[in-house]
């Protein structure tokens, strides 16, 4: 598989400008310091409900996620990355605050991601590198679901106890992970 030439940040749902929300803009800026590497962080269509039927085609046709892409997905974006990798080859997925069910939430149910079983083996077959960040004190996601993603996908899990839903403004550990995937010194 060819070495990656870009990262794509797929944000969590909720709206707002992706480049100024949380760590997304900071990560984009840091990754673009790597020579010859591009990082896309675009506002997603349907940002509140984050419907699979809208997000996955956007990831394919507008963000051009392919086998030279590292998809960095946060929350709903992590779910989109996993569903995308069920049917598309990508270089890597980096999952931040990933989960496996609609959490009993009406908006999550409406997104369409949770209407069928996960195809864990297809994700692993289409994606040679899977890294995960999760925190036991996430106020929105039970640790059990984050651990299930780690177990089913055999991710390289970075487990924290104090990062909540990873809504900070910088994310140094993520930069280190992407650089290791690129074999660039940290």
From Swiss-Prot:
InterPro entries: AB_hydrolase_fold, Hydrolase_RBBP9/YdeN, RBBP9
Single GO BP term: response to nematode
Catalysed reactions, semicolon-separated: valacyclovir + H2O = acyclovir + L-valine + H(+)
Regulation: Inhibited by the natural product emetine produced by the ipecac root.
GO CC list: nucleoplasm
Gene3D superfamilies, per the entry: alpha/beta hydrolase
Top EC class for this record: hydrolase
Region (Involved in binding to RB1): 63-67
Pfam families associated with the record: Ser_hydrolase
Keywords: Hydrolase
Active-site residue list: 75 (charge relay system), 138 (charge relay system), 165 (charge relay system)
Tissue expression summary: Expressed at higher levels in tumor tissues such as carcinoma.
Enzyme Commission code: 3.1.-.-
A GO molecular-function annotation: serine hydrolase activity
Keyword Hydrolase: yes
Stated family: Belongs to the RBBP9 family.
Subunit structure: Interacts with RB1; the interaction disrupts RB1 binding to E2F1. Interacts with RBL1 and RBL2.
Note: Plays a role in maintaining pluripotency in human stem cells in vitro.
Function, as annotated: Serine hydrolase. Catalyzes the hydrolytic activation of amino acid ester of the antiviral prodrug valacyclovir to its corresponding active drug, acyclovir. May negatively regulate basal or autocrine TGF-beta signaling by suppressing SMAD2-SMAD3 phosphorylation. May play a role in the transformation process due to its capacity to confer resistance to the growth-inhibitory effects of TGF-beta through interaction with RB1 and the subsequent displacement of E2F1.
Protein name: Serine hydrolase RBBP9
Natural source organism: Homo sapiens (Human)
Gene name of the record: RBBP9
